[in-house]
Amino acid sequence: MTFKVAIIGRPNVGKSTLFNRLVGRKLALVDDTPGVTRDRRVHAAKLYDLHFDVIDTAGFEDAGASTLPGRMRAQTEIAIHEADLIFFTIDAKSGLLPDDRTFAEIVRKSGKPVVLVANKAEAKGAQGGMLEAWELGLGEPIPVSAEHGQGMPDLRDAVIAALGEARAFGEEEEGEDDEIAATEVLIGEDIADPDAEDAHTYDNTKPMRIAVVGRPNAGKSTLINALIGEERLLTGPEAGITRDSISVDWDWHGRRLKLFDTAGMRRKARIHEKLEVMSVQDGLRAIRFAEIVIIVLDATIPFEKQDLQIADLIIREGRAPVIAFNKWDLIDHPQELLAELREKTERLLPQVRGIQAVPVSAETGRGLDKLMDAVLRTHKVWNSRVSTGKLNRWLEAILAHHPPPAVAGRRLKVKYVTQAKTRPPGFVVQCSRPDAMPQSYVRYLSNSLREAFDMPGVPIRIALRTSDNPFAGRAKKRG
């Protein structure tokens, strides 16, 4: 990447829509409600032959430093400091508001090169807003429609004019594709990067994707900030600060990681606003594309019904869960509570028996190294593979000790087992009558597999297949 662009402006001028247009996918939540974006989101972007990082930011608001809008503004000011170029974005349809003038002055004082982006230029009445924009003193406004992809060639030329050709083009990375991205139709709303892989093409050099989930106000954003050692994500006492899933790249002892902060997940019955529905859906996508999911529980009120529903979703999706009992600094009798919580964990989540559960304090930093050790151990188990020879020796011993029961007077026969996949470990068991096999015996096989091959804390999939003789029927044909 050659440079970094921050998209700045008051709420609801279309910053996230422009961000999505530049990255070529619908990553940021977009809604008519002002203030949807709260954290700053960074992603690789492409504008014709220009390659750069783009930062989506919260809308600038004039507010006290200790308030939520004030803390959002502080995150935006960090983005201005990090950026090489500012896209100061206005709504040409509605024209200038007092906040546009106030924040234009802040951007001007930063001394950074600025491109004045007049968004929603396709709307009726936008011409008046375009003329007003000259009053900001930020140069010629570039008319665009982020929603429809209009005006992108002019935006590209404005970037080159602001930075100069040498800075704008810089040193191209090998093998990069110069296809036009910003004018294409946006498809999909996935949270994952395009490097999603299946079990057979897993590349250990790619960043491990870790989603951090939990109920509102459990301390998810604070935990990520504590892990990476900076105030990267907006935090505070208000529940529901995080709205869309924000990814943060991080290196832990040489291991590349991508952390996804997600919106707090409440019970469906309590979700009424469209924006919260969108936020939760965004979090669900983060889970589906993650490898590890850290479930953050508030240790002062752990194992609410919603916590268990979140854990069940993660297990059904086949992700590898790790539990973080957060706010451990508030606990008076930690040893007694830890023993109680671990017993509850085993009892309430039998599908992932042996799950890693670590007490942490995102506020003080206690337990974070142990949490990351648990993440790496769980990831290794989630990727584990057992040879067919070992599996069938195990099966032989299991059948001798505890054969499957008889059903309708006929004993079920289990003949062969092999591992079909990893991430999570999945096994195919050949048996005489798959439909008749009791689920209790399938659970027995799963628990025995987990214990015999040291696979604690991850979902194990077992598929039953018929063991029909492939040569059956030939004698009949000869007859």
Swiss-Prot record:
<feature type="binding site">
    <location>
        <begin position="214"/>
        <end position="221"/>
    </location>
    <ligand>
        <name>GTP 2</name>
    </ligand>
</feature>
<feature type="domain" description="KH-like">
    <location>
        <begin position="384"/>
        <end position="468"/>
    </location>
</feature>
<dbReference type="InterPro" id="IPR027417">
    <property type="entry name" value="P-loop_NTPase"/>
</dbReference>
<keyword id="KW-0677">Repeat</keyword>
<dbReference type="InterPro" id="IPR005225">
    <property type="entry name" value="Small_GTP-bd"/>
</dbReference>
<keyword id="KW-0547">Nucleotide-binding</keyword>
<protein>
    <recommendedName>
        <fullName>GTPase Der</fullName>
    </recommendedName>
</protein>
<feature type="domain" description="EngA-type G 2">
    <location>
        <begin position="208"/>
        <end position="383"/>
    </location>
</feature>
<feature type="binding site">
    <location>
        <begin position="56"/>
        <end position="60"/>
    </location>
    <ligand>
        <name>GTP 1</name>
    </ligand>
</feature>
<comment type="subunit">
    <text>Associates with the 50S ribosomal subunit.</text>
</comment>
<feature type="binding site">
    <location>
        <begin position="119"/>
        <end position="122"/>
    </location>
    <ligand>
        <name>GTP 1</name>
    </ligand>
</feature>
<dbReference type="Pfam" id="PF01926">
    <property type="entry name" value="MMR_HSR1"/>
</dbReference>
<feature type="binding site">
    <location>
        <begin position="9"/>
        <end position="16"/>
    </location>
    <ligand>
        <name>GTP 1</name>
    </ligand>
</feature>
<comment type="similarity">
    <text>Belongs to the TRAFAC class TrmE-Era-EngA-EngB-Septin-like GTPase superfamily. EngA (Der) GTPase family.</text>
</comment>
<dbReference type="InterPro" id="IPR032859">
    <property type="entry name" value="KH_dom-like"/>
</dbReference>
<feature type="domain" description="EngA-type G 1">
    <location>
        <begin position="3"/>
        <end position="167"/>
    </location>
</feature>
<dbReference type="GO" id="GO:0005525">
    <property type="term" value="F:GTP binding"/>
</dbReference>
<dbReference type="InterPro" id="IPR015946">
    <property type="entry name" value="KH_dom-like_a/b"/>
</dbReference>
<keyword id="KW-0690">Ribosome biogenesis</keyword>
<dbReference type="InterPro" id="IPR016484">
    <property type="entry name" value="GTPase_Der"/>
</dbReference>
<dbReference type="InterPro" id="IPR006073">
    <property type="entry name" value="GTP-bd"/>
</dbReference>
<feature type="binding site">
    <location>
        <begin position="326"/>
        <end position="329"/>
    </location>
    <ligand>
        <name>GTP 2</name>
    </ligand>
</feature>
<keyword id="KW-0342">GTP-binding</keyword>
<dbReference type="Pfam" id="PF14714">
    <property type="entry name" value="KH_dom-like"/>
</dbReference>
<dbReference type="InterPro" id="IPR031166">
    <property type="entry name" value="G_ENGA"/>
</dbReference>
<feature type="binding site">
    <location>
        <begin position="261"/>
        <end position="265"/>
    </location>
    <ligand>
        <name>GTP 2</name>
    </ligand>
</feature>
<dbReference type="GO" id="GO:0042254">
    <property type="term" value="P:ribosome biogenesis"/>
</dbReference>
<comment type="function">
    <text>GTPase that plays an essential role in the late steps of ribosome biogenesis.</text>
</comment>
